[in-house]
């Protein structure tokens, strides 16, 4: 049974069970009164189960028709899809980083709060808060991957921490996803639009089904700089801590940050910029941004060379393949017809069709909007040669991950990540952390660890077509428990290590440091 209150305000390591303290039960009345003047379109309801087993926990895709200020969402209707298609996709978002709900034995009754930030003039910034009736005094604040919504972590993180008694908060980095501009145009139909999939190649593997669908990502707009990603991670922590105190009548004792991909970036920045708000963080394949090393250096190389690699029948010795490998990418996994030798599947092809071009387009338009994306070609973008143009270096520098962490941080990353290649992403951030402290790690309170998941990749669902891969989620969740034990019980964090295919994080690893092989059969 769900009791709902809607207020139109203008505003595998196992920890020993922690005894759950007595506290007031959270209720929507007191929460709503507190959030008046801070939130808009606030919805608060008590649920018998805050896990995703309950269909009400995660809203349906495209279930929002307006911005939080009441203005209608933009977009055109194509292919029978609603005009608001793409702006708000919670169900899709939770499955991007996880294959499904984290199995837990019992329901978690409590209060869920959904709202927008009153302070955002664009009407896009949103958050969700979950307060279990039985609370352990602690809070988890989640980042959001890609351009995903505040429900991005529902499977991987919310389902994992709520049964342990944590309150949970998440946000959308202050920005919605995308809206449809056109379907059917061969060329770019409007400035700042990106096509969802690249066009199919003659004689190649099937391409993405939406090569003629053009969308506009909200976060390329001038009033949505990537610097807001850090702002909303910190703002959500403050808001959730204050609301939890009202809900339970007691202050939060510990706050942890978790997040994946761009959400992992938010975790890193939280440890760098918000040590007064957090006790530690786990970043799962977080995005590394540096003026001289970022995905705009690597991705165009892959976009440019993949068609030639495919035309060479996915020959790993082809010049195109060697160019992609030289850009830091892990090796491809190719499945072939045993009788004909023709490729039937390619890991790189999946990334090319679904991520490489559209991510290049989006990031280039954000940091270097004067480049002619589809006239000159996304694969021909040369970031380093354009650093001297007005605004490019400054906009990247404003979002740099410095490595100057002030609270304990664990990075968990897959060696087969072909969107954020581990050589130039997770390992680069590890180098930044070490450089900031001259290698002196364990003698500091803000310890850092990098746990590399051998054969793990960026997209958990790819383990189905490519069973050679392994999921990262179990290691990320284990890392969270290890972090909590370290912060609260002074337990030693296992050293940075290569987690062998099918293994777990070990106190005495067989392979400390980086994985010698990115892929093992």
Residue spans for each PLM region:
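C-terminal segment of classical bacterial N-terminal signal peptides
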Residues: 13-23
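N-terminal leader/targeting segments
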Residues: 11-12, 143
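Intrinsically disordered, low-complexity sequence elements enriched in Ser/Thr/Gly/Pro
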Residues: 1-2, 21, 92
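Bacterial N-terminal signal peptides that target proteins for export
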Residues: 1-9
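Hydrophobic alpha-helix-in-membranes signature
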Residues: 7, 16-18, 407
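C-terminal His-loop and adjacent cap/lid subdomain of alpha/beta-hydrolase
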Residues: 25-521
């Amino acid at each position: 049974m769900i009791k709902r209150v809607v207020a139109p305000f203008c505003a595998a390591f196992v920890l020993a069970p922690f005894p759950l303290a007595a506290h007031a039960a959270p209720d929507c009345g007191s929460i709503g009164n507190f959030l008046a003047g801070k939130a808009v379109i606030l919805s608060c309801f008590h649920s018998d189960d805050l896990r995703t087993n309950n269909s009400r926990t995660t809203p349906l895709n495209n279930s929002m028709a307006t911005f939080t200020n009441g203005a209608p969402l933009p977009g055109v209707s194509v292919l029978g899809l609603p005009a608001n298609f793409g702006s708000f996709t919670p169900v899709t978002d939770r499955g991007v980083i996880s294959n499904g709900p984290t199995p837990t034995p019992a329901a978690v009754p409590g209060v869920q709060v959904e709202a927008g930030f009153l302070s955002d003039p664009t009407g896009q910034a949103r958050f969700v808060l979950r307060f279990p009736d039985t609370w352990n005094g602690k809070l988890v604040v989640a980042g959001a991957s890609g351009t995903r919504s505040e429900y991005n972590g529902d499977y991987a993180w919310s389902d994992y921490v709520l049964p342990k008694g944590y309150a949970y908060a998440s946000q959308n980095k202050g920005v919605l996803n995308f809206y449809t501009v056109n379907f059917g145009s061969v060329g770019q139909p409007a400035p700042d639009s990106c096509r969802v999939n690249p066009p199919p190649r003659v004689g190649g593997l099937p391409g993405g089904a939406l090569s003629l669908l053009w969308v506009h990502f909200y976060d390329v707009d001038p009033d949505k700089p990537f610097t807001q990603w850090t702002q909303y991670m910190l703002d959500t922590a403050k808001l959730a801590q204050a609301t939890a105190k009202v809900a339970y009548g007691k202050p939060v004792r510990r706050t942890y940050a978790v997040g994946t991909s761009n959400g992992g970036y938010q975790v890193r920045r939280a440890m760098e910029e918000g040590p007064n708000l957090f006790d530690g963080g786990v970043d799962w394949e977080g995005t590394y941004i540096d003026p001289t090393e970022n995905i705009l250096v690597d991705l165009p190389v892959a976009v440019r060379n993949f068609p030639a690699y495919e035309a060479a029948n996915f020959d790993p010795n082809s010049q195109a393949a060697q160019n992609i490998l030289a850009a830091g990418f892990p090796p491809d996994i190719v499945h072939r017809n045993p009788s004909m030798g023709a490729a039937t599947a390619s890991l790189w092809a999946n990334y090319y069709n679904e991520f490489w071009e559209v991510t290049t387009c989006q990031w280039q338009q954000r940091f270097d909007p004067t480049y002619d994306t589809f006239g000159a070609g996304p694969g021909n973008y040369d970031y380093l040669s354009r650093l001297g143009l007005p605004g490019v270096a400054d906009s990247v520098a404003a979002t740099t991950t410095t490595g100057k962490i002030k609270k304990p941080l664990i990075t968990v990353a897959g060696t087969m990540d072909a969107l954020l290649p581990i050589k130039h992403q997770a390992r680069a951030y590890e180098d930044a952390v070490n450089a900031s402290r001259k290698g002196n790690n364990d003698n500091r309170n803000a310890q850092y660890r990098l746990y590399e998941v051998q054969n793990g990749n960026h997209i958990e669902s790819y383990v189905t077509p490519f069973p050679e891969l392994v999921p990262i989620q179990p290691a990320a969740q284990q890392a969270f428990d290890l972090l909590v034990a370290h912060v609260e019980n002074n337990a030693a964090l296992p050293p940075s290590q290569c987690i062998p295919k099918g293994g777990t994080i070990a106190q005495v690893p067989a392979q400390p440091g980086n994985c010698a092989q990115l892929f093992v059969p």
